Amino acid sequence: MTRWAAFAGITLAVLSLLLVLARLSQSAVTAAPVAPEDRRRLDGLDDGAGHLEAPTAPAPKRTPAEATLGPGPEPTTAALLANVAVSHGLLAALLLGGIWLADVPASALGITSAPLSTGLPAVAVGVAVGTAIALANTLAAGLAEALGTDPSERLRELLAPESPGGWALLLVVVLPVIAGFEELLFRAALVGGFAAGFGVSPWLLAVPSSVAFAAGHGAQGRLGVLVTGLLGFALAAAFVLTDSLLVVVVAHYAVNAVEFVAVEGLELRPFG
């Protein structure tokens, strides 16, 4: 017999832990010493330019307390990728353990023997949905960057690797872990599981699930949170319509992979 109350408690506990970790790690993105647009402007100057001369450089306006308690050195890309992969992996293990202990049926989480649930058709639908969302997302990010308001630019720059090995780690390990865990939590558990266990419409559950999904991406700024909320609802709609966890995992991965490869890897700028 499924213990739905226990499942709900574990799911909400995992969600709370994720939001707390997201809040704590947000400082690594928002406390950057140099803004991305300033970095690009400075990189375009000659090595001997006067902006590097110490006598004319303005002194940092920091009190002793701020110097002691303020953010330390900017974390490396490898450290950030490892942190994301490990934290999401541990939370996924905790959630999967709760699902097993509560004896939640796989069908409630969008996992059945139907081809559209776990077969190649599900992969194809996920690729199609993810590509469509990724195209719109990349165009919107390009326009926002051209206007100097791209909310995700700072986060992408921190996570974008600078070596083939780093890209392999990002695309083969980190992004799949992110997509798998976040879809298991925000779509399969909070939408599918809660709908099956408590008789609530999955369309109704898609709203708070998308709000929670957006809240976990505060590092992208207010505009980024809004965009992420819309993305979350689109993925929730895909989950409800297909009743497939695999579809939304593939779609989520496609969105993230296309954005990183197109914007950071290939440096495509649709609007200059």
Residue locations for each model-derived region?
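Juxtamembrane helix-loop-helix connectors linking adjacent transmembrane helices
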Residues: 100-178, 191, 196
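Structural signal for membrane-spanning alpha-helices in multi-pass inner-membrane proteins
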Residues: 22, 95-100, 129, 133, ...
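Short helix-terminus and kink motifs of transmembrane alpha helices
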Residues: 19-31, 134-142, 187-188, 192, ...
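Hydrophobic alpha-helical segments
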Residues: 6, 84, 123, 127-129, ...
